[in-house]
Structures are given as C-alpha cells and as structure tokens.
C-alpha cells in the first residue's frame, strides 16, 4: 500500500485519521506520518491495510489496470 492509497482509502471510507488509527490499533501520528510519505515498519502498514480491507476496500496495484494504482470499495 502506498501512502496515497492509504489516504484515498481512508477518504473513501469517510474515515478521519482517528478512525483508521483506532481500527488498526496504531497512533494518529503513525497514520499522518505514513500519509506524508514516512517509511514505517511493514507490519504497521499491513495493520492499516487490513483494517481498511475488512471494511471493503480493495487496493489496486500498478499493472492491475491500465490506469495504475488506486482503491475501490466492494459493493
């Protein structure tokens, strides 16, 4: 998950930083740092990704579509 995908997914879920932090059991500072491009431990990124995937987010990786990377929500 790229930082921009994290922000896109969070916005798609209509979550603030606090909601993602709570769902992933990380601090709000951690979410903010990641979205600004700071490198985090992979398990921390995985926790945020898993929390959003549990709410229906699908992460689209570069190469999966002609449009590049992004996010979508399962209907």
Briefly describe each language-model feature range.
Residues 4-19:
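Short basic helix-loop element that most often maps to the first helix and adjoining turn
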Residues 10, 20, 48-52:
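Hydrophobic micro-packing sites on short alpha-helices
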Residues 15-29:
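Short alpha-helical DNA-recognition segment
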Residues 17-18, 37-41, 63:
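A short, glycine- and basic residue-enriched loop/turn
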Residues 25-40:
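Recognition helix of helix-turn-helix/homeodomain-like DNA-binding domains
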Residues 42-60:
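DNA major-groove recognition helix of helix-turn-helix/homeodomain DNA-binding modules
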Residues 57-75:
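Helix-turn-helix/homeodomain-like alpha-helical modules used for DNA recognition
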């Amino acid at each position: 998950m790229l930082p921009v995908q994290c922000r896109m997914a969070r916005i798609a879920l209509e979550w603030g930083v606090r909601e993602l932090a709570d769902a992933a059991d990380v601090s709000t500072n951690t979410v903010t740092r990641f979205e600004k491009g700071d490198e985090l431990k992979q398990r921390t990124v995985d926790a945020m990704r898993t929390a959003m995937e549990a709410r229906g987010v699908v992460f689209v990786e570069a190469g999966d579509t002609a449009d590049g990377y992004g996010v979508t929500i399962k209907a």
